[in-house]
Design a protein with these regions (language model features):
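Catalytic cores of TIM-barrel enzymes
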Residues: 1-117
Length: 117
């Protein structure tokens, strides 16, 4: 099967499932952002800051694991914008947390929490 035929087969499968109809088999489209980075030999920080690297990592996994579809990159963000907005509790890979760790909530000390019981 050539690339175009494979694409059409997967597209049909995916769209059929989205229409709540019965595809030939269950389409696979995992949400595995941090995994794709690690599998491609990259850090979470690299894929969070470089969309091209993130996309290449997603494509590598899609090809090697035979996925039907893939999210181009769920972890790419404009980190400067999030920092400028003053998001104090948002851990960005390589900024406040290790580069190998995915995005995290940074819990403040209880006496500094903005939400209290």
């Amino acid at each position: 099967m050539n690339m175009e035929q494979l694409y059409q087969e997967r597209l049909t499968r995916y769209v059929t499932a989205l229409r709540n109809e019965k595809p030939d088999k269950i389409p696979i489209r995992p949400f595995v952002a941090e995994f794709t980075a690690q599998y491609a030999g990259l850090t979470c920080q690299q894929v969070a800051h470089d969309y091209t690297l993130a996309f290449e990592a997603a494509v590598k996994c899609a090809r090697e694991f035979d996925w039907d579809a893939v999210v181009a990159n769920m972890v790419y963000v404009w980190t400067g914008l999030t920092q400028a907005a003053g998001l104090r509790y948002y851990g960005i890979p390589g900024i406040g947390i290790p580069p190998t760790v995915g995005f995290n909530y940074i819990e403040p000390p209880e006496d500094q929490a903005f939400m209290r019981a």
